[in-house]
Amino acid sequence: MCEVSTTEAEKLYIIDFTERTMSVRKVEIHTKIPFIPETTTEMDGLTLNNATSLSVDHVIFDDCQFKDEKGLQIEHCECCLFPSSGNEGCWIMFVEIKDCKPKNIAVYKEKCKSQLVSTIQDFRKHNLISDTNKVHAVI
């Protein structure tokens, strides 16, 4: 089961370590820019500005979290974030990150989009988000 974590940091850094650690580490959310493992070089990733220090919950999905009726794994994005004190009509953000070579960006763009759509559909199917939630998808 995935754990919900909370932060009020002014900046959140969503980083995909998968390629750089040969899958030892995966996606992580940090409040300070992390370094590429075993270097002093900062990792690239998604930076979310939280200037008002809103309390934000976030969940990083594991590889076995999403399954269809037959128990088969369905594609999904990396994580979601939402206000800690959210209500039925609040926003939710789904994120998919690919740490890839520039030549692969065009290929991964459609894959990312498909993963985001699949995750959002699954959340709606299981009534985890309603039609009144404002949904953001970030690649």
What is each stretch, according to the model?
Residues 1-72:
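Basic, amphipathic N-terminal segments that precede the first structured/catalytic domain
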Residues 39, 69-89:
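Histone-fold modules and their flanking histone-like tails across chromatin and transcription assemblies
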Residues 64-67, 80, 102:
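A contiguous catalytic/ligand-binding core that recognizes phosphate-bearing ligands
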Residues 71, 100-104:
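Short acidic, S/G/P-rich loop/turn micro-motifs used as interaction or catalytic elements
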Residues 79-81, 91-100:
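Conserved catalytic cores of phosphodiester-cleaving nucleases, focusing on short active-site segments
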Residues 106-139:
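Catalytic cores of nucleic-acid endonucleases
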